[in-house]
């Protein structure tokens, strides 16, 4: 049953990725990808990004302009700022309702493709053995637990296989995170040490010898 074994592992991996990155981050990524294609909201989303860039540019210029020394220029930038802000709010409100519907649809499809599919597989193949244990290697209670709830005694049930996949994926994920964190910490420490050495050398070179006391 290699195909079913791999399917269960893949579903559990997808569930772990969703839980790791978060549903909101995935929804935002899919929303941006959706608007890259010629969809009904792609034009509005593009205009909103353009308005946001113009708004940030005008806001930066307004903050860099003195309202006392250059009042005329500041007042003009202020009017542009308020106008772009109103346009940006209107564009955002019109897209928020569409994005809310999009997020609900994506969340439903994501649940059906991960947790829903896992529940369906566990129900449909609950009486089927994933693979068989070597006879006589495990005591009766261990065989009963591994075949729980309805798989043949002496076999691995789909529920036990799913739990094993989840445990392995979690262990590998934690190990990878620890290795990456250790590597980044080592690099940061080495860079900090290299920056400290020239500072110490410069400080020692500028020290003036004091008078020795007898």
Swiss-Prot record:
Q: Which Gene3D superfamilies match?
A: Helix hairpin bin
* Signal peptide, first to last residue: none
GO BP of this protein: tail-anchored membrane protein insertion into ER membrane
List locations, semicolon-separated. Answer: Endoplasmic reticulum membrane
* GO molecular-function terms, A-Z: protein-membrane adaptor activity
Specify whether Plastid is a keyword of the entry: no
Swiss-Prot/TrEMBL keywords: Coiled coil, Endoplasmic reticulum, Membrane, Transmembrane, Transmembrane helix, Transport
Q: Which residues lie on this side of the membrane: Cytoplasmic?
A: 25-110, 173-214
Question: Could you tell me which residues belong to the region Disordered?
Answer: 193-214
Question: What does the entry list under GO cellular component?
Answer: endoplasmic reticulum membrane; GET complex
What Pfam families is this protein classified in?
Answer: CHD5
TM stretches of this protein? 5-24, 111-131, 156-172
Its domain of life?
Answer: Eukaryota
Q: How does it sit in the membrane?
A: Multi-pass membrane protein
Q: Which residues form a coiled coil?
A: 75-97
Record InterPro entries: Get1, Get1_fungi, Helix_hairpin_bin_sf
Q: Which ranges sit in the Lumenal compartment?
A: 1-4, 132-155
- Self-association state and partner proteins as the record states: Interacts with get3.
Family in the record: Belongs to the WRB/GET1 family.
Q: What does this protein do?
A: Required for the post-translational delivery of tail-anchored (TA) proteins to the endoplasmic reticulum. Acts as a membrane receptor for soluble get3, which recognizes and selectively binds the transmembrane domain of TA proteins in the cytosol.
- Kindly provide the name given to this protein in its UniProt entry: Protein get1
What gene name is given for the protein in this entry? Answer: get1
